[in-house]
Amino acid sequence: MIPIQLTVFFMIIYVLESLTIIVQSSLIVAVLGREWLQVRRLMPVDMILISLGISRFCLQWASMLNNFCSYLNLNYVLCNLTITWEFFNILTFWLNSLLTVFYCIKVSSFTHHIFLWVRWRILRWFPWILLGSLTIACVTIIPSAIGNYIQIQLLTMEHLPRNSTVTDRLEKFHQYQFQSHTVALVIPFILFLASTILLMASLTKQIQHHSTGHCNPSMKAHFTALRSLAILFIVFTSYFLIILITIIGTLFDKRCWLWVWEAFVYAFILMHSTSLMLSSPTLKRILKGKC
């Protein structure tokens, strides 16, 4: 049990972080969206950033509403908000993974014919890959939607005697729901790890073939990408730690520790959002022109 003062402190920190992320996401979408309307085309990285900005904007609002409803025990509202949060959470994970893959194929200096073929395919079918991420998020939340519908029905009949068979089946269904949600997050995490390893290998190769006295543009691109990926790795790891704590949640008072963990995780998400803004050449060029 933590003091109420600390709970309020971390709650305020979390709200400030969330509002900052919302402003950053809105800025990314507004600036790049205007550029899209003017030139009628965007680079793939900017397409990802616009999609990620929209997804993160919606995710952050869903997260705030979901957490406050959970803290206040508003179960009826919470059941509906959880679906929205899960959808944008999975979509954000996949978009972040696609961003790492794009960094890998654009920055890495490998010349193997298989790598070059994969790079060509990804760049050619990039809009369809983005649509595929949206489809995966939609399919993944179907079990959650069914589970939440059942949960709402049980809440409306909570004054009636419970059937143990129905309760057991519901618990098994929730286990399946958790497994499907975990798989939907593990796959992009594996893609992220593979892309990071390839980038590190490419960076090592660049260091071996260039003098250490100066840093060429290729090296700078590697370091910029790896900095963003390092922050994203912390975000992914932090999220999986929260899942672990959720599993063993009986050891903690969730209402007390909720804001501590949310403030911790969204601090890294805020860092990553800032890093994404600095990693887009188009966004930096437009913002510098406005100043």
From Swiss-Prot:
Residues spanning the membrane: 2-22, 42-62, 85-105, 126-146, 183-203, 229-249, 258-278
Pfam families (UniProt xref): TAS2R
Glycosylation sites: 80, 163
Keyword Cytoplasm: no
Cytoplasmic compartment residues: 23-41, 106-125, 204-228, 279-291
Predominant cellular place of this UniProt entry's protein: membrane
Extracellular side: 1, 63-84, 147-182, 250-257
A GO term, aspect molecular function: bitter taste receptor activity
Membrane topology: Multi-pass membrane protein
InterPro entries: TAS2R
Subcellular location as annotated: Cell membrane
Keywords, sorted A to Z: Cell membrane, G-protein coupled receptor, Glycoprotein, Membrane, Receptor, Sensory transduction, Taste, Transducer, Transmembrane, Transmembrane helix
Domain of life: Eukaryota
CDD domains reported for this sequence: 7tm_TAS2R16
Cellular component, GO, one term: plasma membrane
PANTHER family on file: TASTE RECEPTOR TYPE 2, TASTE RECEPTOR TYPE 2 MEMBER 16
Note: Most taste cells may be activated by a limited number of bitter compounds; individual taste cells can discriminate among bitter stimuli.
Family membership noted in the UniProt record: Belongs to the G-protein coupled receptor T2R family.
Primary role: Receptor that may play a role in the perception of bitterness and is gustducin-linked. May function as a bitter taste receptor for the phytonutrient beta glucopyranosides, some of which are toxic and some of which lower the risk of cancer and cardiovascular disease. The activity of this receptor may stimulate alpha gustducin, mediate PLC-beta-2 activation and lead to the gating of TRPM5.
Quaternary structure (record): Interacts with RTP3 and RTP4.
Designated name of the protein: Taste receptor type 2 member 16
Organism: Pongo pygmaeus (Bornean orangutan)
GN (gene name): TAS2R16
